[in-house]
Amino acid sequence: MNRLQVELPGLSLKNPIIPASGCFGFGREYAQFYDLSVLGSIMIKATTEQPRYGNPTPRVAETPGGMLNAIGLQNPGLEKVMNSELPWLEQFDLPIIANVAGSQAEDYVAVAKEISKAPNVHALELNISCPNVKTGGIAFGTNPEIAADLTKRVKEVSEVPVYVKLSPNVANIVEIAKAIANAGADGLTMINTLLGMRLDLKTAKPILANRTGGLSGPAIKPVAIRMVHEVSQAVNIPIIGMGGIETAEDVIEFFYAGASAVAVGTANFIDPFVCPTIIEELPALLDELGFDHISECQGRSWKQTCHSR
């Protein structure tokens, strides 16, 4: 028995560990360190219809317990992803999750329709929540009606299941999650980065050229855990949890909150072996905690609470 195997809509994962979109590129750099086939899946870098060159520099700033980034969805565009990046990834035993972005609904639909045809793309992740793009993105992720409409439109053209990535920069994430689930989403991924800023001590000006950026890393983990805990009790679709994961213990905590798989982001920049290390350490941790299979951990925090009542 594979104690780590997870079955999700469109995704048969040998383990629940997935590098997060934007922190792993298309895997080429990390393939120099280890066989990517050990991973559960890969969330590839966000793809837009046309190439994007991203925001001006500086784009990254360190913070205590994390980092700020304002990359601006830099990517080679749909045509190159379809003709170069995805074919290259076919050498690995991996179901690919393609992250789709755009400035208007028509952009998402156009990319989703084409990229979902790729043989190794098993699911889409709609990036409706990126906080560092001047147009699009953030508007979709903060309005329940707009988010639901976009989900429906993409579902109509996609040949694979659709997961929607939620923004934490909202007043009521449960309301948005419910709207997206009711619109037919197959799953949710959460959370994206928190909007933040750093100021230069000498100039008193923002360090990032974009002024604001997305905060990621261990600093946001408690926020992510709380939001996964709330949303998982409100919807009946699976959640891929993310936000500050660095260890096998972090993975179990997300499962306890209600996640069915996890994505590892910023930690890949610090340690390129972080994902295979977590995969190797999970079985021993399951033994220590008394679980036969990782699925036994899913939702344990609130399921225990409900049972005790």
Curated annotation (Swiss-Prot):
Answer whether the UniProt record assigns the keyword Flavoprotein to this protein: yes
**Which parts of the sequence bind substrate?**
K45, N69, A70, I71, G72, L73, N127, N192, T193
Q: Which subcellular locations apply to this protein?
A: Cytoplasm
For this UniProt entry, what is the primary localization, expressed as one broad class?
A: cytoplasm
Cofactor-binding details, from the entry? Binds 1 FMN per subunit.
> Which Pfam families does the record associate with it?
DHO_dh
Q: Which reaction does it catalyse?
A: (S)-dihydroorotate + NAD(+) = orotate + NADH + H(+)
Assigned EC number: 1.3.1.14
Its UniProt pathway annotation is:
Pyrimidine metabolism; UMP biosynthesis via de novo pathway; orotate from (S)-dihydroorotate (NAD(+) route): step 1/1
Q: Which residues bind FMN?
A: S21, K45, A46, N99, N127, K165, I191, G217, G243, G244, G265, T266
Q: Name one GO cellular component term.
A: cytoplasm
Q: Which residues form the active site?
A: C130
Q: Which cysteines are joined by disulfide bonds?
A: none
Q: Please name the PANTHER family in this protein's record.
A: DIHYDROOROTATE DEHYDROGENASE (FUMARATE), DIHYDROOROTATE DEHYDROGENASE (QUINONE), MITOCHONDRIAL-RELATED
Q: Which HAMAP family match?
A: DHO_dh_type1
Stated family: Belongs to the dihydroorotate dehydrogenase family. Type 1 subfamily.
**Protein name in UniProt:** Dihydroorotate dehydrogenase B (NAD(+)), catalytic subunit
**Gene giving rise to this polypeptide:** pyrD
